């Protein structure tokens, strides 16, 4: 079982300094089931980060959004610069290459460097947590937990429900965890990936959708 120590380096590369981020207007809420935002990554002009440096790559690739981590104990993330309240966030993710011990997942309620995360590792573990004030805290669990629903060599469909104080994580359409937290009420959504002790994590996201719960 993975221990809490793996989260000691769960510090993300901030491509824009949080304190200088522009104010993002709130997106209008819709009716339950309405699609609030959708990205298929077919065009590279929709505003997601395009980065290539010694730390990694984030870019549109092959009709998806690729994140490659070149450094151990390192993470990258990207957001579309939106502001939502309650959301249901979904995406497909596939490991292209690299170690099966990795991090890949969804974010919600990102504000000024703080957010909730929902992650899996291709060796069969998952977690719900939050990044707040420079610290990573797991929610409803003390370590990443195993799940039989994680496909180790295939596409995984991830879903994160952020509704009121409730956070619920689904992997391949099966609920694996839920937690309660009151710190964040609204914010941006996004995708993230990271490496543990071995660099080279290379994943491709697609079919990113934000739905009114």
Show where each model-derived region lies.
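Short, aromatic/His-centered strand-loop micro-motif at the edge of beta-sheets
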Residues: 134-157
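Localized edge beta-strand/strand-to-loop motifs within extracellular or lumenal beta-rich domains
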Residues: 154-168
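Short carbohydrate-recognition loop motifs
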Residues: 56-75
